From Swiss-Prot:
InterPro entries: Ribosomal_bS18, Ribosomal_bS18_sf. This is Small ribosomal subunit protein bS18m. Belongs to the bacterial ribosomal protein bS18 family. Residues 29-48 are annotated as: Disordered. One of its GO terms (biological process) is mitochondrial translation. It comes from Schizosaccharomyces pombe (strain 972 / ATCC 24843) (Fission yeast). It is found in: Mitochondrion.
């Protein structure tokens, strides 16, 4: 099937680009057929926004969880109330930076694979800052210390150290 594009004026919409698919026998439609098609298409396109809003999926964590038989007040169904309840669920306490609490520099521990292996995965990759709970500066210094220990041959590169605490 071949398609052609027709610009047709629609009321209060400007020009609408319509894709018309020719029939299987590949005959051209007359002008009156195109006008009827474009009028029907413009009526359908005026409802598109409404249909899109109705069909939009609201995430489950933003909708109130009310089941049959529950007693609720209208305030429980407000968006702000539901959002506040869900934010409380996802809250995680901030982890403390262990190097900052003892006021030490992670670079001082590059010769100690037991301490450094706490910040390495089983496959030898340096854990990200979200997992370690370190500040950005100490995470940077720690990764530098781990790389230095690997270059010196103190720590393995492809797996976690056998002599680690964990």
């Amino acid at each position: 099937m071949l398609g052609r594009r027709i610009f047709s004026p629609a009321p209060n919409r400007g020009f609408i680009l319509c894709n018309l698919i020719q029939s299987n026998n590949s005959t051209r439609r007359g002008f009156s057929d195109n006008r009827k098609f474009n009028e029907r298409n413009s009526e359908a396109s005026s409802n598109v926004g409404f249909q899109r809003r109705v069909r939009s999926n609201i995430p489950s964590y933003l909708s109130a969880s009310v089941e049959e038989g529950d007693i609720y007040s209208p305030n429980d169904l407000l968006f702000e109330t539901v959002k506040a309840k869900n934010q409380a669920k996802f809250y995680e306490p901030v982890r403390e930076d262990c190097f900052k609490t003892v006021n030490e520099n992670p670079m001082n521990y590059w010769k100690n694979p037991v301490i450094l292996s706490r910040f390495v995965t089983e496959l030898g990759r340096i854990k990200p800052r979200g997992d370690t709970g370190l500040t950005a500066k100490n995470q940077r210094l720690l990764s530098r210390a781990i790389r230095r220990a690997r270059a010196a041959g103190i720590m393995p590169t492809k797996y976690k150290s056998v002599y680690s605490e964990n």
